[in-house]
Amino acid sequence: MCDQQEIQCCGPIPQCCVKGSSFGPSQFPYANNQVLVEAPCEMQFLECAAPCPIQVSQTPCQSSTTEVKGQAPCKTTNVKCQTKTTQVKCQPKTTEIKCQAPCQAQVSCVQCQAPCQSQVSYVQVPQPPQTYYVECAPVYYTETRFVEYPVSNYVPVPAPQPGYTYVECPSLGQGQGQGSFSTRYQYQGSYGSCTSQSQSRGSYSSCGPQHQSQASYSYCEPQFQSRPSYTNCGTQRQSQASFGSCTSQLQSRASYSNCSSQRRSGTSFSTCAPQCQGQGTYGSFTAQRKSQSASRCLPSRRLQPSYRSCSPPRHSEPCYSSCLPSRCSSGSYNYCTPPRRSEPIYGSHCSPRGRPSGCSQRCGPKCRIEISSPCCPRQVPPQRCPVQIPPIRGRSRSCPRQPSWGVSCPDLRPCAEPHAFPRPCRPQRLDRSPESSWRRCPVPAPRPYPRPEPCPSPEPRPCPRPRPRPEPCPSPEPRPRPRPDPCPSPELRPRPRPEPCPSPEPRPRPRPDPCPSPEPRPRPCPEPCPSPEPRPCPPLRRFSEPCLYPEPCSVSKPVPCPVPCPAPHPRPVHCETPGRRPQPSPRSQPCPHPEPMPRPVPCSSPVPCGDPIHCPSPCSGHNPVPYSQELGCHESNPCRLDTEGPSSYSFSQGQESNGCCVSGGVFSGSRGLSGCGDQGNTYRGMNCGACGGTQGAYF
């Protein structure tokens, strides 16, 4: 059978019927209705091995025509009789008719297109009333063709049209991309089972796979056109999930080598990087869910631009839960405040970044100028670094310059940290940044020792825990600690500690003088009224400013108390950690230690600047800055400044004064990256130009 000899049959393509050759039934009928068919000499014949080994015989054309459908390995032949032919019936015995090859001029009625090329030979015959289809499985022979007509194989069918009827049998072996025949469309309805498909295998990897992929492709045929882009339909099916139809894939194909690869491409880009671009094109891909950075690629890319080196915004996580640039006025911050903690941001600028010790390592806090010094000379020269630090703290360059300043800072940090912690956002950074700052600056360690005493003054800062600001005001009292009376007022702040309350009497003393008006505000919380003094305490938060200038702060603070007191309260609301501040409140007892605070007094050099006064003035509400100062106050601690100041805002150079700090500085950015107390991108704050010798610090 041809299938058995498929290779042989298909092999000698040239042996197949030559295109242009024609053969037709001889005009000489033979007995038994056998017809001798003459064909061109060059024509090869196939022998059909079948139960009835009979060559197709055609009688002179009768009213009906017989069409023989021969499936041959090399070719299929369609034979139509131009004249009416009588139906040949297969007897139990079939006679064989050998086709004589002698070339006859008379043989012209049948055209045989070379099956090797077209795989189909068409025979055109005037339409007979009936057409008989005879199937014979030819076996390849060089010279003879045997056609058998089992009676059962005859299927009478009316001719489809008055024109010519074409009958094709897809040949088994040879499919050279000629897969489509004019008649093929009869079968084309679905390649459900087209043996010939194997022939067109050149075009289709396999018809079976096509069916599988048909879910995505309405037809296999489209694959022909799309084929160049698709290795095989099977693969398309896999990608099908991503694309409604692979047909569209073709367009997108340019970016993706294949559908399945696209799915894999999701790995390279959280979502396929191309998908971000093509996201409009593709509603959504299963792969997109893979995007880890963001629900959508686009935002993540935006994040990257917004934070050039802020890959570690994790430090700023408090601020950027989703790393959305909008929350942090990233535009204003080349680096998220956290980046300073994430030295990696400054890796290029600060080789020391890696090491925990050394302010240079703080370079990461580049966001905070104080840290910017050695590591980040570009942002701020080392000399600036100290200067910048005071601006953040609102104190003075002198403090940052002096390791002692750092000493005070540690204490302030403990105290201030509670303050900062109340702010949900900052506390995290505070924790981290202070730690990092400690690591970075070994100097602070010594500072803590002296500062333990100052720390009590920060404890008044815990009074700020009431940051309703009343408590912060008490912190200023610790600054006034030189004013023993104010110190008791911090105790009042711990008001839970009634014992310290006795000191409140001193507090009233400051109250009448500094803030008679503040008292009304404290009146909402009468005890907080002393807090107005604590309001100056926020300058302490600013770092050691209040500590450095406790008296100035306290003096002005009482006055500021009235206005800021109400405002701070909302901020305390933001600060959930006030409890921590109360913890320092015990330190408020150390508040008597304000004497250590005089140590900051060296830093008090800023006092002349009156910046502390400015701090209180915000506290007092004299400055529109008060809220920013509250931030400043929280940030007042040098340690916290590292964490808070920059995160909350950046200093604008525009504010510069010989007096270390001048209120009215503009901070751009939100108070806290966390969004705590975010009040817009600009904030007024202390700007230290003269102290640091720098106009301003950029975060």
Curated annotation (Swiss-Prot):
Tissue and organ distribution: Expressed in the stratified squamous epithelial layers of the skin, esophagus and tongue.
One CC-aspect GO term: cytoplasm
Phosphoprotein in keyword set: yes
Xref: PANTHER family: KERATINOCYTE PROLINE-RICH PROTEIN (PTHR48138:SF2), KERATINOCYTE PROLINE-RICH PROTEIN-RELATED (PTHR48138)
Record keywords: Cytoplasm, Phosphoprotein
Official protein name in the record: Keratinocyte proline-rich protein
Lineage of the organism: Eukaryota, Metazoa, Chordata, Craniata, Vertebrata
Annotated gene: Kprp
Claim: Secreted is one of the keywords in the record: no
PTM-bearing positions, type Phosphoserine: 436
UniProt biased composition (Pro residues): 448-477, 513-533
Cellular compartment(s): Cytoplasm
Ranges for region Disordered: 448-533
Native source organism of the sequence: Rattus norvegicus
